[in-house]
Amino acid sequence: MVGVIRRLNVVRELLNIRAGPGAALLPKEVTKVHMQFAHRIEEGHMGPRKFWRENLPKLKYWNPAVPMVINRTTDQKGPAVMTIYFRDDKDAKPSSTPFPTSSADGSSPAPKPAQGERIVTIDMKNRNSSVILKEFLDKTGAVAVQPTAKDEEEFREFEDLHRRSEIDRERIRKMNDAKKREKAMLAKAMSDAQSIKAASA
């Protein structure tokens, strides 16, 4: 049972990251992606956070060479902005200035575009993650990745495993309940026997 659950979790993670909203190939002109939003979801930061947790991993999976940096701040009333960097000059050499690493203390703001680059921003505040994703795909020209036949087959296998695991889980629950009832009945019988014995002494 534990092995089945472990396999279910692995299959679920693979399917979730390979397909679905956010699985898309970015054009080569996109050089970097930067997101800034607050730690908590209040004040309009729920959509950006959900995009970061659910959509960005898929984008990173399909575009491993594109740096994607997250700058989380403690300013709930502050902006929630995505900055997308494009290379305008196809012959321009990549910038030698290191792109900042992700930060949880607001210390990695979006840098200015390098020479030969331009930026496009998306205001994410008070917006649903699906709306943010649509604007991202529209502005970048990214192409959504469709599930392959193998993905669909694995999804069917996952559904079958999930269904069987639910059946097994219910069967084990009933067995455990029966054992508990049997144990309770045995304890009651022993208690009754002790009471009868004590009464007849």
Swiss-Prot record:
Region (Disordered): 87-118
Subcellular location: Mitochondrion
Superkingdom per UniProt: Eukaryota
Disulfide bonds: none
GO molecular function annotations of the record: structural constituent of ribosome
A GO CC term assigned to this protein in UniProt: ribosome
Listed Polar residues bias regions: 94-106
Quaternary context: Component of the mitochondrial large ribosomal subunit (mt-LSU). Mature N.crassa 74S mitochondrial ribosomes consist of a small (37S) and a large (54S) subunit. The 37S small subunit contains a 16S ribosomal RNA (16S mt-rRNA) and 32 different proteins. The 54S large subunit contains a 23S rRNA (23S mt-rRNA) and 42 different proteins.
Protein family: Belongs to the mitochondrion-specific ribosomal protein mL61 family.
Protein task: Component of the mitochondrial ribosome (mitoribosome), a dedicated translation machinery responsible for the synthesis of mitochondrial genome-encoded proteins, including at least some of the essential transmembrane subunits of the mitochondrial respiratory chain. The mitoribosomes are attached to the mitochondrial inner membrane and translation products are cotranslationally integrated into the membrane.
Name of the featured protein: Large ribosomal subunit protein mL61
